[in-house]
């Protein structure tokens, strides 16, 4: 009887361990994906006016579906759809890529020109390597990190 009780106790312990570890309660730390809240950091009229809902990413224009610095995304902002360029995210990236306090984006037009005339925060120097694509965004940036 004691062996049966010991066996049942170990079974209860194992089943409790499996039930606790079968799922994670913390969110995964990824850069920018669908439904991620972002912060518009240029001085465009659409991004600088307050609104009761923050802008959210509704599509990432790459294969993996996770946007990093330099990727284009589609935003839902104030009831409109606008393209944006990611200039900073919260997830720690590769070496020599800074980690920001928020997911920062710059609004761009369909042809790649920025909507605003000034970027309020420093942007990573890793965007300078992609100068041909985003030369006008780099031209309105004041500081680089």
Curated annotation (Swiss-Prot):
Mitochondrion listed as a keyword: yes
Localization: Mitochondrion
CC terms in the record's Gene Ontology section: mitochondrial inner membrane; mitochondrial large ribosomal subunit; mitochondrion
InterPro entries for the chain: Ribosomal_uL14, Ribosomal_uL14_sf
CDD domains: Ribosomal_uL14
Keywords: Mitochondrion, Ribonucleoprotein, Ribosomal protein, Transit peptide
GO MF: structural constituent of ribosome
Residue interval of the organelle targeting sequence: 1-30
SMART domains: Ribosomal_L14
Pfam family, one: Ribosomal_L14
HAMAP family for the chain: Ribosomal_uL14 (MF_01367)
Its job: May form part of 2 intersubunit bridges in the assembled ribosome. Upon binding to MALSU1, intersubunit bridge formation is blocked, preventing ribosome formation and repressing translation.
Family the entry assigns: Belongs to the universal ribosomal protein uL14 family.
Protein name, entry field: Large ribosomal subunit protein uL14m
Origin species: Mus musculus (Mouse)
């Amino acid at each position: 009887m004691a062996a049966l009780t010991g066996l049942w106790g170990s079974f209860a312990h194992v089943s409790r361990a499996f039930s606790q570890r079968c799922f994670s309660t913390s969110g995964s730390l990824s850069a920018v994906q669908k439904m991620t809240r972002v912060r518009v950091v240029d001085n465009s009229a659409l991004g600088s006016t307050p609104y009761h809902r923050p802008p959210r990413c509704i599509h990432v224009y790459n294969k993996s579906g996770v946007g990093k610095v330099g990727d284009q995304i589609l935003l839902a902002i104030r009831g409109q759809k606008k393209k944006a360029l990611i200039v900073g995210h919260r997830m720690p990236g590769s070496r020599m890529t800074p980690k920001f306090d928020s997911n920062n984006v710059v609004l761009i037009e369909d042809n790649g020109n920025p909507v605003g005339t000034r970027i309020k925060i420093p942007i990573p120097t890793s965007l300078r390597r992609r100068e041909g694509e985003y030369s006008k965004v780099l031209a309105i940036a004041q500081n680089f990190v």
